[in-house]
């Protein structure tokens, strides 16, 4: 296995394991700093939006233009971009809102857990773990492909997705812990949901390695850009605003874009 593949896989694994951090927060503390969470999620959205539109979309277009010509290359980049959005939106739609970790208020779970039926809480946590696993699969592919293309790009996306995964880990562990009072169960299930990211990377690698051409790279990368834009707009920003002030979320967003822009400029 080449160093670049090992590096990209390691990034994906670390990003996925960030759900474990969220799970620890879920059963060790009832006090999640909402302002810090708002800024962090906004920052993550900024990184992902900037890199999707400025770097990944452009790389996809360049790769497809080499194979298909400028006009056809651009058309197929746009098509693949919206296919990526459609796929992740469909996954999101197929997960019922109550069990979807992106539709849940984890603060409310913590505050009202004593009044809830424990079996219902446990079911919520288990379905949240399943939902997060489904969502993390394409995110793992996005991180892996980015790491293969450009180490700096891969690190930035891995950090953004890791930040995104922390509240997801909390969404799994909080209901399971308050239902079972078992830290071990809460941590293990949250941890396993995060492993869907490296599994997505492995699956993507084995499926695409025999077909890996400029055309394949361009189509997959454009789809990855669409997936990341959807995650940012549908999950990260709404969740950031739910936990804190609108302007804090936007400040984090701009900060993430700025940091990403500077980091890309430094490695030109």
Curated annotation (Swiss-Prot):
Q: What do the Gene Ontology cellular component annotations say?
A: plasma membrane
Record field: catalytic activity: Zn(2+)(in) = Zn(2+)(out)
Q: Where does this protein hold Zn(2+)?
A: 139, 164, 168
Which residue spans traverse the membrane? 5-25, 38-58, 72-92, 124-144, 152-172, 187-207, 211-231, 248-268
User: Which residues does Fe(2+) bind?
Assistant: 136, 139, 165, 168, 197
A Pfam family annotated for this UniProt entry: Zip
Q: Which InterPro entries match?
A: ZIP, Zn_transptr_ZupT
The protein's superkingdom reads Bacteria
Q: Which compartments is it annotated to reside in?
A: Cell inner membrane
An MF annotation (GO) of this entry: zinc ion transmembrane transporter activity
Which keywords, in A-to-Z order, does the entry hold?
Answer: Cell inner membrane, Cell membrane, Ion transport, Iron, Membrane, Metal-binding, Transmembrane, Transmembrane helix, Transport, Zinc, Zinc transport
By sequence similarity, the record places it as follows:
Belongs to the ZIP transporter (TC 2.A.5) family. ZupT subfamily.
Q: Report the function annotation for this chain.
A: Mediates zinc uptake. May also transport other divalent cations.
Q: What is this protein called?
A: Zinc transporter ZupT
Q: Which organism is it from?
A: Chlorobaculum parvum (strain DSM 263 / NCIMB 8327)
Report the gene name.
Answer: zupT
């Amino acid at each position: 296995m080449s160093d670049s593949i090992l590096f990209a896989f390691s990034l994906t694994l670390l990003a996925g394991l960030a759900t474990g951090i969220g799970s620890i927060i879920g059963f060790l503390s009832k006090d999640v700093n909402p302002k810090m969470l708002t800024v962090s999620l906004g920052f993550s959205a900024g990184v992902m939006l900037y890199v999707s539109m400025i770097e990944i979309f452009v790389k996809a277009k360049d790769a497809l233009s080499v194979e298909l010509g400028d006009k056809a290359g651009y058309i197929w980049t746009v098509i693949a971009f919206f296919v990526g959005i459609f796929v992740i939106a469909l996954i999101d739609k197929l997960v019922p809102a109550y069990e979807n970790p992106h539709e849940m208020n984890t603060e409310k779970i913590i505050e009202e857990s004593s009044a809830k039926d424990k079996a219902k809480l446990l079911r919520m946590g288990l379905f949240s773990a399943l939902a997060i696993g489904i969502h993390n699969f394409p995110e793992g592919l996005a991180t892996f492909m980015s790491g293969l293309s450009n180490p700096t790009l891969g690190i930035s996306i891995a950090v953004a997705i890791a930040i995104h995964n922390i509240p997801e880990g909390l969404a799994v562990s909080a209901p399971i812990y308050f239902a079972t009072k078992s830290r071990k169960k809460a941590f293990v299930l949250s941890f396993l949901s995060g492993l869907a990211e490296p599994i997505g990377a492995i699956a993507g690698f084995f499926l695409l390695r025999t077909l890996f051409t400029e055309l394949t790279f361009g189509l997959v990368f454009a789809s990855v850009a669409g997936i990341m834009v959807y995650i940012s707009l549908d999950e990260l920003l709404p969740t950031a605003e739910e936990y804190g002030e609108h302007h804090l979320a936007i400040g984090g967003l701009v900060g993430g874009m700025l940091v990403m822009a500077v980091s890309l400029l430094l490695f030109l």
